[in-house]
């Protein structure tokens, strides 16, 4: 969930009582809640609470992983005032696609646990001033009554109240009582009553006997009469009475048939038992459907416990105990499983589990489950089962949970269940849950899914993941003969319900060609229309019509729009064949001719489907005829209406969302697909599309579920003849129809009037035109248009308004205002097209009505005449536009209103550009908002007749003939120059791949942009893309798109995930193998190679001067696995193994030249170290390797002809091992050294060692500076540690994200501790630097632990080691003997007290990195975080952008970080071209020119 960012938030102790209790103030935000949970209470409640922080245990909220509170909005309590009625209100924003989610529903445990702030309330009241770390909070009782469920994306609100206290004999609080109400959107969801928690010492907790059955309890159980289960055992799985761990995991994946068999309706079940992380039942050793005292079922489940399971350390910090809510959730999971086992789902069809409304669920906790190896045993007895008033089945159960501690020798015996609950500590019931009640609620009566799932695009098909299965058809050249198909007579009896209605699309022109198939036809409430578009002839992509296989042809798309969906997408979509689900637009709006390919799909298990709907790229094509109906209806023959452009851009998204199976993630069959918003950029408005194929590359950028809604996000890019002219981003939603029953619009349901009505503009200022077909308004509006004008829309189909109201010089900006109204007619042509079974007006046509209003304003105000434009016509102005839809118009709507406010009118270079913002209403509800509508008035061809005479006419033979007779397209010229401001200049500079021609008026200083070089008078800003930076051979050698690699951060901080993420975007990443044991390096290499079989990737080889076996083991692994790129770092001298790796990859090409397979990047910080990598391998090392048989004579001979490394990465002031040298000093020295040695060694040009730069590269300026100094590539390091893929913990990421360049210092290094070598680390938020330096000081001062003063040794043990020296030494011995297999080192240390001291100190130094990477909560102050000064520049660079964790709520992606740094460097290079040109006088240091990462790349 995104963090709520507060600027200058006031701490609670500075708030007034009114601010604390008003409910309108954010009393505590998420950051403060996290601090309370994991950090210091004094920082949250105020200085008076600071003394509590000295206690190792105190009342806390759970840590981040189970912290289920987002904010506190009310605190009505006072410190040290234990009063009844104290109150607190909290909120929790349920995350979408959260890791605890049950397929959209909020699980039982989260609903209950999100009311956890009774902990914070009693803490605020001061309980720890009494407990003083000796007593800890434990929940005892609670009764929960549910009235519904919550869904992802909703906000839970908890009103928590204190109802009483109990005191000990010494007057201290022993227990407190509380209750809460939980609401969602004002609706009561949960009542929690009888809440009770106590405060206990360790001794009191240990003495607890658990839940003890009284004699009355036992007597009552003995009197219970058994009931008959048979009426409810609909189809019990009697063959399956135990479940294994694997089978329980399978139920999490919704695969019930694999566990219980294909009978009893199991294949049709589409229900996820729980989130994988939330699975609290690992196995079920017993299912007895006639067992238990009630005879309705006895089920026994088991949860395996390990000390390191996730739920212990997060609940709570330094007081680990399993949360009762999680334990109780296991009861819910068992009951769900049993109800399905009985076959009750056969009575409902598709279902959801819901709590039984109004039924109390009582929980008693009488023992703590602290970390241990063992298991929980759940003993569930069904006490009631039946059907409610809606005939939904329900079940109620009692559950006892028994804690079995293997470490205490405890066991569980099924045969002795009766002994539990009798007070025996070895048979202790820790939780007693009475009355858990669930029902199976019917989802719908829609058609169920087929029992056999067939993938849309099976993995084995050659078409998946590649476009190479068939070459995409090239965009055709303009041809006057490429026209729309001739109409074919439609048959009669075409409406749904007519027994004579055809079942095939016999009127499709393509079906009339011999050998072609005929698409099927499914009648609807509307009569079909003629086929408006057919593919251009001769395209080989249009021949194979196999459903679900790329490409999808005209036949597949015809099926998708009005036939059988499964005949387009494959049999998995059969359930949609007869549903009312949205389809691809039909007839006149069918603007996807074919889907050429889909790539980048990720075939994984995702909810109930077999691919990740967030991953995929599709190429769609539209063959645009020269005389399409929309051209005939436009103002001139070559003008494509903006609505059609929008549809072409967006419709491929509608195909891709289905190919990615998003509809299959929805529970219902009748689901609706709606565009929500978009940002688009018309980058080239001079392209003629007639007779050409428009290609659309649409990429999915994300998919998420929000309750019953799925949201899909895409980017798109349109091109013709490889010229990109339109691009943008958009999002769509999949909805159930009920969502639109009461649409809220843009104003939260409030209806409003158009602006001129609300502002009561005098009627005399409003000029109205009736523009219905045949009405006089069409003629009068255009009566005064200049001679030869083509400004009017020429057909009724191109008109979207009945009446237009214009107010000159009015609107919000005083530049012009237009209002239009249309009476919605259920027979409007577009309802049949969009969509065939789901009629709704396309949003694009609503936007088009706004364009029509802007055109009317331009005509009314005679903008063409005022600016002397001859033969004016309508065309497009390049630029950006955005739209947002929050409602719809359907055939049931009555009236559509739209309005526009002109925001600018600019005349330049022979054209006039009009820009406006607009809104649209559906029956008084404002539902659309559009910004930056752009219309251009430009000179065109003289009109063949007056504009008035063509009003309402159809496209005549004259128009068609004029289209055919043109020999070439006639784009409207934009003029030789265009005046631009600084904002526009920056926008143009950011178009990195386009040259920019500029001039400047010497008098006014006005900048002008030209379309060409303007006879040499313009400054030329050359394109600069990523490939134009650095040395291109670096990119060619490693197969990457950028002159950059992400450097290896040791101990897996540069993780496999980080390397894979970079590699998938063709960026080289180096895995941080240094300091890791061999088995982890092997696992990482296997993972990387599986994900990147063709690369690119590198693995770090770090010099190990004290363990040559480790270096050899790594090289053995690299050669075994075929690792072809190694980053060699920290080498103070060349070693046999690094030379062996290089030589082992050498062979001869056919021409005798050396073929290099194994590449080395040498990471150095000194000239003498660079020299050893630039020269050939030393002779003595080659001879040694030959003698040992590790290389051949041939390989040695070849090694004498090549440098040891292909690349040198010059490491300047950086994190970890560093010489702190500035890059502007060391980089030129090493480049000069390389040049000299290259000549001296006589290498050919192909063997020139490239020199790159690393250290301090945290922003575009640093990258640009290094590259301008001659770096062939750059290396990033510290900045990648902040990224979500790095192998460290969120505590470290958080600390790094708040660091500045000065928050670093030097501290002793573990690997070369004795030599006094230091490394650069983060000092903010950790005591590691001072403690590590203290250890080195002691090492230098004393020869042994025995010679240290006792107080010094005690300080080391208590403050630094935090354990006894004997324990440290034992762990050190275990590590060297069992992990490093180096007992000799320990034997030496036993004889050498100084070495023993060194090894123990290195124990701390080494573990400090592990604690940081693993996020060990109780060693936060000892975190060792390698960090360079680049972190300060990086944090400043991303502040306030989408990469900023405080803005996005998540840590950035390594790909985005590195691409943005490089893109910024490209931009700066172009900006510097202006700075250095004497013809341009521009203040480039202006804040307007600062590069900021504004969107995902």
Swiss-Prot record:
Residues 944-977 are annotated as: Disordered. Disulfide bonds: none annotated. Keywords: Fatty acid biosynthesis, Fatty acid metabolism, Lipid biosynthesis, Lipid metabolism, Lyase. Residues 1026-1470 are annotated as: Enoylreductase (ER) domain. The keyword Lipid metabolism applies. GO terms for molecular function: (3R)-hydroxyacyl-[acyl-carrier-protein] dehydratase activity; trans-2-decenoyl-acyl-carrier-protein isomerase activity. The keyword Lipid biosynthesis applies. Polyunsaturated fatty acids may be beneficial in prevention of cardiovascular disease and treatment of mild Alzheimer's disease. Polyketide synthase-like protein; part of the polyunsaturated fatty acid synthase composed of the 3 PKS-like subunits A, B and C. While the saturated fatty acids (SFAs) in Thraustochytrium are produced by the conventional fatty acid synthase (FAS) pathway, polyunsaturated fatty acids (PUFAs) including docosahexeanoic acid (DHA) and docosapentaenoic acid (DPA) are synthesized via an anaerobical PKS pathway. PUFA synthase assimilates fatty acyl-CoA, the product of FAS, as the starter unit to synthesize DPA, and this starter unit may be butyryl-CoA, hexanoyl-CoA, or octanoyl-CoA. The homology between the prokaryotic Shewanella and eukaryotic Labyrinthulomycetes genes suggests that the polyunsaturated fatty acid synthase subunits have undergone lateral gene transfer. This is Polyunsaturated fatty acid synthase subunit C. It comes from Thraustochytrium sp. (strain ATCC 26185 / S-3). The gene is ORF-C.
């Amino acid at each position: 969930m995104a963090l709520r960012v507060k600027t200058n938030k006031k701490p609670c102790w500075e708030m007034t009582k009114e601010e604390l209790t008003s409910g309108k103030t954010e009393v505590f935000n998420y950051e403060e809640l996290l601090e309370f949970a994991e950090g210091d209470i004094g920082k949250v409640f105020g200085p008076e609470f600071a003394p509590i922080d000295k206690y190792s245990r105190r009342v806390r909220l759970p840590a981040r992983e189970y912290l289920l509170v987002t904010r506190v909005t009310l605190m009505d309590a006072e410190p040290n005032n234990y009063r009844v009625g104290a109150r607190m209100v909290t909120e929790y924003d349920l995350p979408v696609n959260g890791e605890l989610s049950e397929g959209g529903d909020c699980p039982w445990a989260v609903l209950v646990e999100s009311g956890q702030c009774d902990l914070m309330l009693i803490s605020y009241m001061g309980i720890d001033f009494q407990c003083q770390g000796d007593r800890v909070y434990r929940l005892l009782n609670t009764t929960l009554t549910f009235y519904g469920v919550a869904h992802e994306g909703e906000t839970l609100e908890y009103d928590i109240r204190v109802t009483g206290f109990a005191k000990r004999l010494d007057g201290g609080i022993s227990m407190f009582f509380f209750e809460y109400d939980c609401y969602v959107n004002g609706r009561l969801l949960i009542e929690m009553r009888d809440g009770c928690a106590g405060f206990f010492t360790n001794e009191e907790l240990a003495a607890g006997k658990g839940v003890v059955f009284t004699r009355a309890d036992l007597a009552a159980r003995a009197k219970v009469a058994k009931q008959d289960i048979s009426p409810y055992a609909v189809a019990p799985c009697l063959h399956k009475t135990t479940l294994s761990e694997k089978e329980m995991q399978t139920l999490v994946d919704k695969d019930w048939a694999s566990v219980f068999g294909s009978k009893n309706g199991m294949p049709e079940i589409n229900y996820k038992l729980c989130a994988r992380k939330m699975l609290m039942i690992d196995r079920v050793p017993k299912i007895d459907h006639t067992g238990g005292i009630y005879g309705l079922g006895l089920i026994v489940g088991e949860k395996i416990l390990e000390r390191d399971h996730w739920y212990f350390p997060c609940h709570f910090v330094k007081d680990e105990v399993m949360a009762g809510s999680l334990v109780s959730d296991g009861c819910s999971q068992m009951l769900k499983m049993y109800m399905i086992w009985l076959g009750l789902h056969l009575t409902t069809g598709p279902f959801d589990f819901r709590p039984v409304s109004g039924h109390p669920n009582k929980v008693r906790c009488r023992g703590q489950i602290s970390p241990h190896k063992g298991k929980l045993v759940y003993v569930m007895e069904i006490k009631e089962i039946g059907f409610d008033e809606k005939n939904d089945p329900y079940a109620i159960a009692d559950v006892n949970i028994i804690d079995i501690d293997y470490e205490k020798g405890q066991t569980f015996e099924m045969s002795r269940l009766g002994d539990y609950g009798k007070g025996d500590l070895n048979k202790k019931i820790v939780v007693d849950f009475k009355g858990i009640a669930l029902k199976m609620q019917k989802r719908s009566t829609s058609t169920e899914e087929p029992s056999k799932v067939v993938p849309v695009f099976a993995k084995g098909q050659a078409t998946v993941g590649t476009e190479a299965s068939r070459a995409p058809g090239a965009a055709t050249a303009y041809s006057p003969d490429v026209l729309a198909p001739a109409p074919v007579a439609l048959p009669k009896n075409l409406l749904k319900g007519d027994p004579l209605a055809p079942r095939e699309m016999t009127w499709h022109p393509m079906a009339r060609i011999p050998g072609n198939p005929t698409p099927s036809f499914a009648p609807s409430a509307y009569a079909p229309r003629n086929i408006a578009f057919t593919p251009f002839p001769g395209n080989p992509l249009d021949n194979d019509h196999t459903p679900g296989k790329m490409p999808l042809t005209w036949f597949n798309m015809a099926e998708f729009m009005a036939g059988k969906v499964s005949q387009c997408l494959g049999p998995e979509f059969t359930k949609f064949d007869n549903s009312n689900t949205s389809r691809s637009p039909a007839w006149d709006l069918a603007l996807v001719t074919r889907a050429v390919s889909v790539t980048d799909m990720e075939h994984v298990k995702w909810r109930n489907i077999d691919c990740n709907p967030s991953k995929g790229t599709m190429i769609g094509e539209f063959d645009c005829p020269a005389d399409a109906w929309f051209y005939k209806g436009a103002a001139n023959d070559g003008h494509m209406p903006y609505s059609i452009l929008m549809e072409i851009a967006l419709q491929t998204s509608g195909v891709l969302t289905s190919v990615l199976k998003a509809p299959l993630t929805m529970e219902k069959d009748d689901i609706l697909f709606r565009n929500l918003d978009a940002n688009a950029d018309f980058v080239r408005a001079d392209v003629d599309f007639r007779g050409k194929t428009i290609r659309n590359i649409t990429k999915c950028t994300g998919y998420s579920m929000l309750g019953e809604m799925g949201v899909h996000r895409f980017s798109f890019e349109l091109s013709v003849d490889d010229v990109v002219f339109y691009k943008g981003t958009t999002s769509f939603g999949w909805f159930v129809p009920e969502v639109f029953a009461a649409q809220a619009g843009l104003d939260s349901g409030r209806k409003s009037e158009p602006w001129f009505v609300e502002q009561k503009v005098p009627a005399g200022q409003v000029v109205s035109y009736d523009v219905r077909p045949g009405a006089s308004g069409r003629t009068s509006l255009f009566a005064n248009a200049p001679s030869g004008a083509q400004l009017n829309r020429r057909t009724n189909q191109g008109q979207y308004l009945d009446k237009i109201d214009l107010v000159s010089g009015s609107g919000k900006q005083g530049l012009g205002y237009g209002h239009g109204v249309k009476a919605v007619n259920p027979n409007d042509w577009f309802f049949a097209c969009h969509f065939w079974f789901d009629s709704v007006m396309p949003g694009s046509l609503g936007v088009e009505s706004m364009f029509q209003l802007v055109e009317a304003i331009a005509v009314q105000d005679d903008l063409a005449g005022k600016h002397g434009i001859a033969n004016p016509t309508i065309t497009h102005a390049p630029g950006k536009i955005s739209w947002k839809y929050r409602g719809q118009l359907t055939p049931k709507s009555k009236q559509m209103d739209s309005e526009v406010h002109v925001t600018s009118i600019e005349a330049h270079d022979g054209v006039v550009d009009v820009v406006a913002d607009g809104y649209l209403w559906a029956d008084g509800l404002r539902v659309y908002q559009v910004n930056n509508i752009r219309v251009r008035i430009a000179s065109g061809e003289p009109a063949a007749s007056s504009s008035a005479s063509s009003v309402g006419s159809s496209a005549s033979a004259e128009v068609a003939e004029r289209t055919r007779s043109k020999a070439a397209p006639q784009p409207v010229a934009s003029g030789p120059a265009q005046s631009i401001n600084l904002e526009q200049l920056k926008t143009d500079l950011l178009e990195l791949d386009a040259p920019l021609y500029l001039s400047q008026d010497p008098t006014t200083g006005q900048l002008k942009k030209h379309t060409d070089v303007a006879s040499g008078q313009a400054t030329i800003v050359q394109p600069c893309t990523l490939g134009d930076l650095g040395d291109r051979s670096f990119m060619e050698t490693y197969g990457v798109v950028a002159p950059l690699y992400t450097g290896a951060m040791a101990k897996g901080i540069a993780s496999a995930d980080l390397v894979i993420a970079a590699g998938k975007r063709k960026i080289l990443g180096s895995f941080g193998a240094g300091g890791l044991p061999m088995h982890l390096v092997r696992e990482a290499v296997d993972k990387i190679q599986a994900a990147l079989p063709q690369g690119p990737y590198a693995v770090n080889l770090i010099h190990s001067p004290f363990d040559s076996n480790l270096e050899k083991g790594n090289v053995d692994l690299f050669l075994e696995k075929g690792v072809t790129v190694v980053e060699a770092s920290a080498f103070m001298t060349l070693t046999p193994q690094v030379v062996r790796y290089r030589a082992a990859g050498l062979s001869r090409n056919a021409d005798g030249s050396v073929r290099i397979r194994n590449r080395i990047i040498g990471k150095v910080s000194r000239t003498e170290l660079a020299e050893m990598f630039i020269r050939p391998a030393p002779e003595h090392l080659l001879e040694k390797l030959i003698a040992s048989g590790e290389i051949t004579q041939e390989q040695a001979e070849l090694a004498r002809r090549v440098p040891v490394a292909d690349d040198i990465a010059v490491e300047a002031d950086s994190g970890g091992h560093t010489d702190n040298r500035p890059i502007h000093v060391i980089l030129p020295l090493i480049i000069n050294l390389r040049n000299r040695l290259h000549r001296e060694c006589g290498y050919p040009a192909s063997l020139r060692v490239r020199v790159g730069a690393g250290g301090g590269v945290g922003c575009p300026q640093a990258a640009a500076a290094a590259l301008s100094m001659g770096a062939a590539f750059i290396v990033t390091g510290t900045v990648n540690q902040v990224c979500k893929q790095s192998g460290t913990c969120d505590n470290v990421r958080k600390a790094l994200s708040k660091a500045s360049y000065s928050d670093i210092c030097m501290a002793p290094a573990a690997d070369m501790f004795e030599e006094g070598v230091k490394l650069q680390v983060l000092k903010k938020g950790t005591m590691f630097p001072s403690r590590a330096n203290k250890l080195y000081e002691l090492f230098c001062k004393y020869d042994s632990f025995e010679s240290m003063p006792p107080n010094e040794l005690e300080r080391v043990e208590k403050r630094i080691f935090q354990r006894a020296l004997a324990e440290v030494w034992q762990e050190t011995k275990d590590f060297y003997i069992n992990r490093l297999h180096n007992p000799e080192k320990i034997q030496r240390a036993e004889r050498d007290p100084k070495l023993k001291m060194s090894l123990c100190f290195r124990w701390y130094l080494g573990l400090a990195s592990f604690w940081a990477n693993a996020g060990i909560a109780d060693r936060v102050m000892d975190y060792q975080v390698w960090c360079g000064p680049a972190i300060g520049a990086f944090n400043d660079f991303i502040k306030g952008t989408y990469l900023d964790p405080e803005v996005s709520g998540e840590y950035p992606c390594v790909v985005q970080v590195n691409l943005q740094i490089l893109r910024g460097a490209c931009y700066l290079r172009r900006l510097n071209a202006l700075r250095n040109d004497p013809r341009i006088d521009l203040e480039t240091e202006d804040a307007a020119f600062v590069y900021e990462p504004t969107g995902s790349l």
